[in-house]
């Protein structure tokens, strides 16, 4: 929000300097980003009147002018501007004057007594561009007729004015106008507020335009009036152009300038239609698929049922609350207009402009909420200015109210406000603060029931009112005290470890932590989760961040691509974050949203060489078993099962479902070749994703005696059908450990696999495979005898033979 200080002080004029006012606004939550002068420094530039103009004797494009600059003597100045003429008043740079430098950082341009083609020139007549007031260099800057000759140009044009630029938070829509800032300034400083002088215009016509509001959920109130006989070619007054330019808005034409001026003044966007281009009445409705509209910016957009429009009997005329259409735009030939000011529901405007990749001042205001009680007053204000500047005759205001917000009172407890703010603020002082803010309230003990005014869409809950009390009371008045808390020794739950410890464990295994958005591209959800119906955002910050993620895989691959594009050769990253899944069984709670599960997961990705390139080890790409080892180390001492299964994002033959205590807790595997090709990856990364709960839970450490006796190791090779999974054999051997004969078995590990090849069978048929296991046995009480070991091995083999038809390989 940008505005000149002089405009603000027409509404409220606190006894503060510019810097003090800036500080007061910033400390109340209206952050002043910058203060800059309305014009660069100048010296000895005054108002002059051109008395006479004659052609230069030796140059066709130059004129010799006689100028009265209030110095007591007529000055002769050579000028080449095409619009120089006797009688006009212009800025005159006297000899010795200093103009702003041509380039930023350069030296000021000094005016000297000089000769141009043999004719002496005693100064220079200036354009607005030469004074750095605008980019207009078409000719001299013509000043209003009433400007006193000889007056310093800085005084005449108020060039010592200061332009404020304020960075507003999204909730402060009520401050998107000069009057809104003035209202806040009055509340902050206690200075009196002068409301705009808005008087109803006498209706000289009886004509109204038929208006139908077909979508009350789009438009709650629509006010308008017909004005005939306007002069669209009228010149916008200098004071209005000056205020608009200092607010960052260039002058277009009188009708457009007036509409923009009132928007900056009062915060109400409005629209002026060319009445003669409207076919019949107008209808405020939702758009229809297949309709199109050419906008004022020249773009033609395709409409659908999610955007609001204003249409007539023949065509769509305007994109409701965002931008007018080209077909009914006013021009310099317009004589009859229809003026409109409406209340558009914020939800019906929010995000619609971004949908078409542009933004407007109107959409910026309406999507945040604009006062719904003042549409008629603002129509009167615009009408007043149009009749004063462009002339014409106005009809009556047609005000249609169909659906306005019902603002329920918001309660605030003074005791809670004091507890949150941290200082004792008396109830009478709180009442005074609410009064200064224009918040109507009722008191019941220490409870204030505040009815939010129509211009405050940000007041909905108790904390909103506490914020208002704090910022008007003054954050600077709140003493800075260090927090005091009693130290308390809490018992440590040894059955759980923190997510912080897990992150440290991953970092110790050479993974770097990354943090990504929880909202992702819808295409990622299809690719990495097989999800065609993700949780969609109503108001995404970008089109490629439109859905909530249900897996971390997409985010990790995105980080991988980002690093590969920067020539990284080895990438190992992890993320601890939430995913969002639609689940009707979830009930609303303090940390839960009804209908949506938000489990926390940990995902990791490894890509490139297992270790950094070195002379002592051959380079090898990371594989499934490397990452599986990292995951097992992370889960230890909890054992995990890895069950062959398919996942949309993973290689069908190199992926597994992770199970702990019989429950599926995650996935591990190599990226699917289809996705590797789609995302242009030279090698397939290996990834895992696991529920955080499975990692934080752990059994209490159980001490066991270290055996003094040597372990016994036996290798066995069993032949099974190729369809039998290794994990299934491990599961059966684990069950066998419950047998008394296997009580000394400490560990079983697979160390070899053999399958028949074309040139050698190894005694196996084509559908068989040989698996070699190393069984480690140990007794803490004594050395194991061969009979005990043989019995344990035979029990394991018998178990596999009975269930899967396994046989010892000869």
From Swiss-Prot:
Species in which this protein is naturally found: Burkholderia pseudomallei (strain 1710b)
Annotated residues for binding of Mg(2+): 458, 464, 467-468
Alphabetized PROSITE patterns for the sequence: B5, FDX_ACB, TRBD
Cofactor(s) needed for function: Mg(2+)
The protein's name: Phenylalanine--tRNA ligase beta subunit
GO biological process assignments: phenylalanyl-tRNA aminoacylation
Gene: pheT
Reactions that this protein is recorded to catalyse: tRNA(Phe) + L-phenylalanine + ATP = L-phenylalanyl-tRNA(Phe) + AMP + diphosphate + H(+)
Residues annotated as domain FDX-ACB: 707-809
Localization: Cytoplasm
Subunit comment: Tetramer of two alpha and two beta subunits.
Main location: cytoplasm
B5 domain sequence ranges: 405-480
């Amino acid at each position: 929000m940008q505005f000149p200080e002089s405009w603000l002080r027409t509404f409220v004029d606190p006894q503060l300097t510019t810097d003090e006012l800036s500080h007061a606004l910033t400390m109340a939550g209206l952050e002043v980003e910058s203060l800059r002068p309305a014009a660069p420094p100048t010296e000895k530039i005054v108002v002059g009147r051109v008395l006479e103009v004659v052609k230069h004797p030796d140059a066709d494009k130059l004129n010799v002018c006689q100028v009265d600059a209030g110095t007591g003597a007529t000055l002769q100045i050579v000028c080449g501007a095409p619009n120089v003429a006797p009688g006009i008043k212009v800025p005159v740079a006297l000899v010795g004057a200093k103009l702003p430098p041509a380039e930023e950082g350069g030296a000021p341009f000094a005016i000297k007594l000089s000769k141009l083609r043999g004719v002496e020139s005693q100064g220079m007549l200036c354009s607005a561009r030469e004074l750095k007031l605008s980019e207009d260099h078409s000719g001299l800057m013509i000043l209003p007729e009433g400007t006193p000759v000889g007056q310093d140009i800085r005084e005449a044009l108020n060039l010592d004015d200061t332009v404020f630029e304020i960075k507003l938070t999204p909730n402060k829509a009520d401050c998107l106008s000069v009057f809104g800032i003035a209202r806040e300034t009055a509340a902050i400083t206690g200075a009196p507020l002068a409301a705009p002088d808005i008087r109803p215009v006498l209706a000289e016509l009886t004509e109204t335009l038929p208006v139908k509001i077909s979508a009350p959920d789009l438009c709650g109130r629509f006010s308008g009036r017909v004005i005939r006989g306007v002069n669209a070619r009228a010149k916008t007054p200098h004071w209005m152009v000056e205020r608009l330019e200092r607010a960052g808005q260039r002058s277009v034409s009188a009708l457009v300038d007036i509409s923009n001026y009132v928007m900056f003044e009062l915060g109400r966007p409005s629209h002026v239609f060319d009445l003669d281009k409207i076919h019949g009445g107008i209808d405020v409705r939702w758009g229809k698929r297949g309709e199109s509209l050419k906008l004022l910016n020249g773009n033609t957009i395709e409409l659908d049922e999610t955007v609001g429009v204003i249409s007539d009997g023949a065509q769509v005329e305007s994109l409701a609350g965002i931008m007018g259409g080209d077909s009914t735009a006013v021009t310099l030939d317009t004589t009859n207009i229809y003026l409109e000011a409406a209340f558009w529901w914020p939800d019906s405007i929010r995000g619609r402009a971004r949908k078409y990749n542009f933004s407007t001042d109107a959409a910026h205001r309406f999507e945040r909420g604009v006062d719904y009680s003042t549409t008629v007053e603002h129509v009167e204000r615009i009408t007043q200015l149009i009749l004063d500047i462009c002339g014409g005759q106005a009809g009556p205001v047609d005000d249609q109210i169909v659906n306005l917000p019902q603002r329920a009172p918001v309660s605030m407890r003074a005791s809670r406000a004091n507890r949150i703010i941290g200082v004792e603020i008396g109830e009478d002082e709180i009442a005074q603060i609410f009064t200064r803010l224009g918040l109507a309230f009722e008191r019941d003990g220490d409870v204030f029931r505040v009815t939010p005014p129509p211009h405050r869409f940000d007041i909905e809950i108790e904390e909103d009112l506490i914020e208002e009390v704090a910022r008007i009371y003054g954050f600077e008045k709140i003493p800075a005290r260090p927090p005091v808390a009693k130290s308390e020794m809490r018992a440590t739950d040894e059955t759980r470890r923190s997510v912080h410890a897990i992150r440290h464990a991953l970092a110790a295994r050479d993974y770097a932590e990354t943090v990504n958005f929880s909202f992702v591209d819808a295409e990622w959800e299809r690719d990495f989760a097989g999800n065609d119906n993700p949780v969609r955002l109503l108001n995404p910050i970008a089109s490629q961040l439109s859905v909530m993620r249900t897996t971390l895989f997409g985010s990790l691959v995105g980080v991988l691509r980002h690093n590969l594009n920067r020539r990284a050769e080895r990438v190992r990253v992890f993320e601890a974050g939430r995913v969002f899944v639609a689940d009707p069984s979830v009930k609303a709670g303090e940390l839960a949203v009804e209908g949506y599960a938000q489990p926390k997961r940990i995902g990791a990705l490894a890509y490139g060489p297992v270790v950094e390139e070195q002379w002592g080890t051959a380079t090898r790409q990371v594989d499934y078993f490397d990452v599986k080892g990292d995951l097992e180390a992370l889960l230890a001492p909890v054992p995990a099962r890895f069950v062959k299964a398919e996942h949309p994002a993973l290689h069908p033959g190199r992926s597994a479902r992770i199970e702990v205590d019989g429950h599926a807790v995650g996935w591990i595997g190599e990226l699917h070749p289809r996705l590797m090709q789609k995302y242009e990856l030279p090698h397939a990364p290996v990834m895992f994703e696991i529920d955080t709960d499975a990692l934080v839970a752990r059994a209490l450490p159980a001490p066991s005696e270290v055996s003094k006796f040597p372990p016994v190791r036996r290798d066995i090779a069993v032949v099974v059908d190729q369809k039998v999974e290794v994990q299934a054999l491990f599961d059966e051997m684990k069950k066998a450990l419950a047998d008394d004969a296997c009580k000394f078995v400490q560990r079983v590990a697979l160390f070899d696999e053999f399958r028949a090849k074309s040139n050698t069978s190894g005694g196996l048929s084509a559908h068989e495979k040989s698996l070699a296991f190393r069984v480690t046995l140990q007794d803490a009480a004594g050395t194991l005898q061969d009979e005990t070991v043989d019995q344990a091995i035979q029990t394991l083999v018998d178990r596999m033979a009975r269930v899967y038809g396994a046989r010892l390989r000869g």
